[in-house]
């Protein structure tokens, strides 16, 4: 199978390496210098240092040529840009008249200005295109790059998209499950990043494992309430892309969002943390959107509110935790 992966960050690089073990795979990045480095060393020293990439993986700085690789009906295009870059990528595909038949995206979050989910952005930019959907689940790029076991879910209304994605990714140490609850998968992937900041704050304050468990459990309730209001199915939020991804992101040392929370608890400013991180922390980008959507649907999300207070409203992490603890008792 021919596969084009668009975006050579850590996640795009790791998945391109996995795909190249079985398929004719091209990895695209707009940075020609990065492509030159990748072609020379077969290692992404910027974003996934220390992980050797297969010699069969090819690299491309020309987007048109990369898209040509995925135009065949039997091919697959994997969009590995952040949410903030998704619309521009789709628009470029459309304007070039190089829209692949089957598209999956890896980003998690909501578009900041519109508060749209990724699939809604796709519907706006690629009207009439149906063989598409998110590939999501509990996964750290470094572990995937190292060939460690992982399970992901592809969600699409299109059976062809689901089948094509499973055929591409389901080999080696990677298991792919499939379903059609696109909304549930995308809500889970967005909200878990915000909740991971909360658990990072609690861990950074030394509040203990009991507090972490409470935040994860009550956070899952917030995720489920918002997801149901937006049209997701309840069972999705106890699956890989809901509870599974939440557990990993809220507890794993490789989690950028948890790291942000821990650093906030230590007293560092958000700007300093993000500058030092050097990578996207989607929980910071989409926290306001999650809270705004919750408020517009009259959904109570106190943990999300606390995270937004710390990130954007000048509330000290310990004061935000104290406010949560002062909330009135209520039935579970």
UniProtKB/Swiss-Prot annotation:
GO cellular component: cytosol
Binding-site residues for NADPH, renumbered to this chain: 11, 30, 108, 141, 256, 280, 282
Catalytic function, reaction form: sn-glycerol 3-phosphate + NAD(+) = dihydroxyacetone phosphate + NADH + H(+); sn-glycerol 3-phosphate + NADP(+) = dihydroxyacetone phosphate + NADPH + H(+)
Metabolic or biological pathway, per its Swiss-Prot or TrEMBL entry: Membrane lipid metabolism; glycerophospholipid metabolism
Pfam family, one: NAD_Gly3P_dh_C
MF terms (GO), sorted A to Z: glycerol-3-phosphate dehydrogenase [NAD(P)+] activity; NAD binding
One record GO biological process: glycerol-3-phosphate biosynthetic process
Keywords, sorted A to Z: Cytoplasm, Lipid biosynthesis, Lipid metabolism, NAD, NADP, Nucleotide-binding, Oxidoreductase, Phospholipid biosynthesis, Phospholipid metabolism
Domain of life: Bacteria
Bridged cysteine pairs (disulfide): none
EC number(s) given by UniProt: 1.1.1.94
Gene3D superfamilies, sorted: N-(1-d-carboxylethyl)-l-norvaline Dehydrogenase, domain 2, NAD(P)-binding Rossmann-like Domain
Entry binding sites for sn-glycerol 3-phosphate: 108, 137, 139, 192, 245, 255-257
InterPro entries in alphabetical order: 6-PGluconate_DH-like_C_sf (IPR008927), 6PGD_dom2 (IPR013328), G3P_DH_NAD-dep (IPR006168), G3P_DH_NAD-dep_C (IPR006109), G3P_DH_NAD-dep_N (IPR011128), NAD(P)-bd_dom_sf (IPR036291)
Localization: Cytoplasm
Active-site residue list: 192
Function text: Catalyzes the reduction of the glycolytic intermediate dihydroxyacetone phosphate (DHAP) to sn-glycerol 3-phosphate (G3P), the key precursor for phospholipid synthesis.
Family as reported in the entry's similarity comment: Belongs to the NAD-dependent glycerol-3-phosphate dehydrogenase family.
Protein name from the UniProt record: Glycerol-3-phosphate dehydrogenase [NAD(P)+]
